[in-house]
Amino acid sequence: MLSRAKPQHLRGQRRDQANQCHRSPCQVSRKYIDNQMILSTHAIVGGAIASLVPSHPAAAAIAGFASHFAIDAIPHWDYPLRSISLGKGANNRRLSFSSATLTDFAIVGIDACAGLGLALWMFATEGSIWTIAVGAFTAMLPDALQFVHTLYPRGLLHALQRFHWWIHSKRALTGLFGVGSQLAFAGMIAVLARSFY
């Protein structure tokens, strides 16, 4: 099983950050955070972009994939993963299928399916359903590749993840403000996309 132990001084810093965030909405350094943005947000944005090019699935795929990095550059909230690590330098090669690991996979799977379902519900028509699905899927894909990279940190995956970490916001929003900001952002993108119909 992947060790989640942290040096004592890092655990202390994370406790201090958590105590500060319980008192008020805040931003904390992502240096000690290895979670991910809600996949549903990425899927909704990818679906919204795909709805603008309903007859061009290849363009939807490229734009959806690129949108992931643009959104990750914005400070946002992450949900915690108990066993899977996705931070810089993460290594999941010794990950075992414990209850914590299965819970993490279940949460991520529900998140991804919910995002795909919402994207299809909000944007898909009879003639664009596959394009919307492609846009939503590719918008979530970089986080899946990030996990694959923790298992096989080589080649193009390594170069992609270096870029992913570089562009990713180093500040994290917390609490209700963090959750609300993502809901508001996804809603705003959806409204903007539908205004072009």
State each model region's role.
Residues S3-A5, R14, A18, S24:
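Short linear motifs in low-complexity or flexible loops
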